[in-house]
Amino acid sequence: MSFNHKTIEELHDLLVAKEISATELTQKTLEDIKSREEAVGSFITVSEEAALKQAAAIDAKGIDADNLMSGIPLAVKDNISTKGILTTAASKMLYNYEPIFDATSVANAYAKDMIVIGKTNMDEFAMGGSTETSYFKKTKNAWDHTKVPGGSSGGSATAVASGQVRLSLGSDTGGSIRQPAAFNGVVGLKPTYGTVSRYGLIAFGSSLDQIGPFAPTVKENAQLLNVIASSDVKDATSAPVRIADYTSKIGRDIKGMKIALPKEYLGEGIDPEIKETVLAAAKQFEALGATVEEVSLPHSKYGVAVYYIIASSEASSNLQRFDGIRYGFRADDAKNLDEIYVNTRSQGFGDEVKRRIMLGTFSLSSGYYDAYFKKAGQVRTLIIEDFDKVFADYDLILGPTTPTVAFGLDTLNHDPVAMYLADLLTIPVNLAGLPGISIPAGFVDGLPVGLQLIGPKYAEETIYQAAAAFEAVTDYHKQQPIIFGGDK
């Protein structure tokens, strides 16, 4: 018997009633992972021994009836540090790296007696939109194994969508939670910048990175955010604001809520059928009592260009620490210190990572800093101001998560610009530090379509309220791929 169709609350009730033990749930989860792994390739590392040991310890002390997450398995993206469990960032550079500390988000999960079941595949150092730049493997879409799962958190999304796990953690720098959530038909949230500590997250773009949850439903997503969100003295960018319960508005109606629909989000480059899906969702929100009106975010069209200058510049700085001296891969054909640096980085980094390091180094160079990095920062401010103007009059922004449904494996990985444009609709949210969620909203050609809801800073409760209201009157979240036991 598999438990992957049961919600976290249902699993908790079974654990409290002792109808199953944490060990049995962990064993069943490991079986679900193994039985589906060859088809989708969600995991880099499955921490079977450590997970079973932790489950046995939880059983020995007993399930805490007041702790919803006690004994619940959790998959963690492989750029989030886990003490004693390989954390590779899907790179040859860190193929053998075993951290000596836990990321704060993982420590928070352990504090609630969650069980880390394994580390999920991703684009190398979170740089990519298809999980094809991983050094280890290519993850496949849960709905169609000839399609990409999205990225960079493709493994975390596919693990949930395929029924390997119920909950997982990802990171989002320019859409890396929301895009794979959309491609796989699950719920993925990028919290407000600073809501979840970045301590222990292998840095890509420090002003953009944020850890967030994946789950099959809106409520379960909020329940996991309750666990991982916290202020943290170990992260200088950690926010002091802390909402007591992100599920508190779930179940409330949305009558009177004002929702903005940017015309730029339904313009050039957006698949016509995705546009139709979003407009149908807008009508659904109106039927629920909300007001949906067209607005403009005029500077959003510059988001991709701004993002790739800023993110690449920050990456070129952050990745200087990987030099073959302290930890990780070290080239064995070097004859002096200079060759250690050059050979290690040449052999240890993949093509996409090297491309972004070079772009970032160029943007930060003395002759081009003002023209590129400084100018990108100025346009970033204009993008933020656009959002501020909209949120002065509206509660949320509505739009598609992605311009298309999942594309084919090996179709865009040799066309960086086309790959970058896949994040056209998610990038502005990171540039502004806002919360954004992707929820299932329909299907095009048998593939899931994601609907994105964006809020002002610290408006996760309102986002969850609206997302749950939409979920309650639709059944897209209930439809599952064949690998999960569905009929699609």
Curated annotation (Swiss-Prot):
Gene Ontology biological-process entries: translation
Coiled-coil ranges from the UniProt annotation: none
One GO CC annotation: glutamyl-tRNA(Gln) amidotransferase complex
Classification via HAMAP family: GatA (MF_00120)
Protein family per UniProt: Belongs to the amidase family. GatA subfamily.
E.C. number: 6.3.5.7
UniProt-listed PANTHER family: GLUTAMYL-TRNA(GLN) AMIDOTRANSFERASE SUBUNIT A, TRANSAMIDASE
Signal sequence region: none
Record InterPro entries: Amidase, Amidase_CS, Amidase_dom, AS_sf, GatA
Catalytic activity annotation: L-glutamyl-tRNA(Gln) + L-glutamine + ATP + H2O = L-glutaminyl-tRNA(Gln) + L-glutamate + ADP + phosphate + H(+)
Quaternary structure annotation from Swiss-Prot or TrEMBL: Heterotrimer of A, B and C subunits.
Residues at the active site: 77 (charge relay system), 152 (charge relay system), 176 (acyl-ester intermediate)
One MF annotation (Gene Ontology) recorded for this entry: glutaminyl-tRNA synthase (glutamine-hydrolyzing) activity
Keywords: ATP-binding, Ligase, Nucleotide-binding, Protein biosynthesis
Enzyme class: ligase
Descriptive protein name: Glutamyl-tRNA(Gln) amidotransferase subunit A
Stated role: Allows the formation of correctly charged Gln-tRNA(Gln) through the transamidation of misacylated Glu-tRNA(Gln) in organisms which lack glutaminyl-tRNA synthetase. The reaction takes place in the presence of glutamine and ATP through an activated gamma-phospho-Glu-tRNA(Gln).
